[in-house]
Amino acid sequence: IELLPILIQTARGLFVAHSHGVIHRDVKPANIMVSDTGEVKITDFGVSYSTGQGQITQDGMVVGTAQYISPEQAQGQQATPQSDIYSLGVVAYEGLAGHRPFTGTTPVDIAAAHVNNPVPPLPDSVDVQLREFVMSMLAKDPLDRPKDALVVSRTLARIERRLLDQ
């Protein structure tokens, strides 16, 4: 299964959710289902947050999976569309490198690494444009990440087309 089409479709799906005020908060491979025809479905919106509803989690409450959690979520801050972009960046990193960017003995150690540790570079074997873009998705500051998930899907689609044309 090719990684880029999965990432592109997942980003599109997240953009649709975000444009309806829904933030997933737990983007990870287990929540990205791929059909036999290659169609992607994002599952488990059980911990999602709707910007239109009252706050259902207390300030400081951490929601998400440690291996894929954004730095701001790990610090108990409100998740935003950029939080989902970060988590999708972790999925992309794992697909390209063969391992997650951060490990630790406990979920707290892993979440702390997302906050405090620089993201290890992706292998040189990964296309330089793709490498740089995935690293931008993993920026510690949400404002340094791509503007929205549509930008993510379009940029990845452009990179995919260029790689296919080579």
Positions of predicted regions on the chain:
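Eukaryotic protein kinase
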Residues: 1-165
